[in-house]
Curated annotation (Swiss-Prot):
L-ornithine binds at residues 168, 232, 236-237. PANTHER family: ORNITHINE CARBAMOYLTRANSFERASE, ORNITHINE CARBAMOYLTRANSFERASE, MITOCHONDRIAL. Carbamoyl phosphate binds at residues 57-60, 83, 107, 134-137, 274-275, 319. Keywords: Amino-acid biosynthesis, Arginine biosynthesis, Cytoplasm, Transferase. GO terms for biological process: arginine biosynthetic process via ornithine; citrulline biosynthetic process; L-arginine biosynthetic process. This is Ornithine carbamoyltransferase. Pathway: Amino-acid biosynthesis; L-arginine biosynthesis; L-arginine from L-ornithine and carbamoyl phosphate: step 1/3.
């Protein structure tokens, strides 16, 4: 089956069917193989792409820049000091940039900003991350799971997400799983469970796809027999440090350590993380957390993160291939 996603925005996975998501994954796999083989064909030659980053980034920025370069496109980086939303409305910015550029990436805060860009730019707009959604990450995640899934299809896999299940990763993983028929278990304290309206919407999607959503505060129930465990940061650099104590105390029982790995009863289980991860005291934040809370590592321990269970760096590499696929599918010649 062929898909035509040309000129489509990529703002959230709710906008796409399961088959369209699988098409993007397959395209990312093809582009990855072509890059390794030295046979990549440039589909974005002569295109100009704006990268708007109101939030800082390493992986997302590098992934977009390298993917665009590989495909023959030119990029302009627009940082947090731009006039968008300050001296010029998002709507006006969209209409201006849409005259200069063939595609626009946005990474920032409210989903309403990227939706406004998508409505008014007149060119494809891609969501590099908002407070509500992180859709490009999921294409990379599902691609990585297929690489490490021992031949299983996505609809045969079980994934446990540990921690804050109401953040952008919890939302995106739940929707992504519901779209492709995967079983996902969101494991965390009740105060961190996702919005009931979104859960209801995803349960309706599961009736079509055959997926399954389990939400629990019981770690043993959540991880038993899963193929993958997924973690995300507990503390954000954008929030006051006085909130850290509450979040860390609430989420401490959901740290991924070797006991959790053992509890899966699956020797082939793999650990995933969208990165950056706080797994030791080798960063300023990690050192501060160790001094203040007497913890080496937060969402994952060092022994798990540095073990053969971890596939985080394959996952990080696949950010570039999957972002390239999204740009080629929506903008490529």
């Amino acid at each position: 089956m062929s898909f035509n996603l040309r000129n489509r925005n990529f703002l959230k996975l709710l906008d796409f069917t399961g088959k369209e998501i699988e098409h993007l994954i397959a395209l990312a796999q093809d582009l990855k193989h072509a890059k390794y083989a030295g046979t990549e064909q440039q589909k974005l030659k002569g295109k100009n792409i704006a990268l708007i980053f109101e939030k800082t980034s390493t992986r997302t920025r590098c992934a977009f820049e390298v993917a665009a370069h590989d495909q023959g496109a030119h990029v302009t980086y627009i940082g947090g000091g731009s006039q968008m939303g300050h001296k010029e409305s998002t709507k006006d910015t969209a209409r201006v940039l849409g005259r200069f550029y063939d595609g626009i990436e946005y990474r920032g805060f409210g989903q309403d900003v990227v939706e406004t860009l998508g409505e008014h730019a007149g060119v494809p707009v891609w969501n590099g991350l908002t407070d509500e959604w992180h859709p490009t990450q999921i294409i990379a995640d599902w691609m990585t799971m297929l690489e490490h899934g021992n031949g299983k299809r996505l609809n045969q896999m079980k994934l446990a997400y540990m921690g804050d299940a109401k953040n952008n990763m919890g939302n995106s993983l739940m929707v992504g799983a519901a779209k492709v028929g995967m079983e996902i278990r969101l494991v965390g304290p009740k105060a961190y469970w996702p919005d009931p309206a979104l859960v209801a919407e995803c349960n309706e999607l599961c009736k079509i796809s055959g997926g399954k959503i389990v939400i629990t505060d019981n770690v043993q129930e959540g991880v038993d027999s899963v193929d993958f465990i997924y973690g995300d940061v507990w503390v954000s650099m954008g929030e006051p440090e006085e909130l850290w104590a509450t979040r860390i105390n609430d989420l401490a029982p959901y740290q991924v350590n070797m006991s959790v790995i053992t509890a899966t009863q699956n020797p082939a289980v793999k650990y995933m993380h969208c990165l950056p991860a706080f797994h030791n005291d080798e960063t300023r934040v990690g050192k501060k957390i160790e001094e203040k809370f007497n913890m080496k590592g937060l969402e994952v321990t060092e022994d798990v993160f540095e073990s053969s269970y971890t596939i985080c760096f394959d996952e990080a590499e696949n950010r570039m291939h999957s972002i390239k696929a999204i740009m080629v599918a929506t903008l490529g010649d």
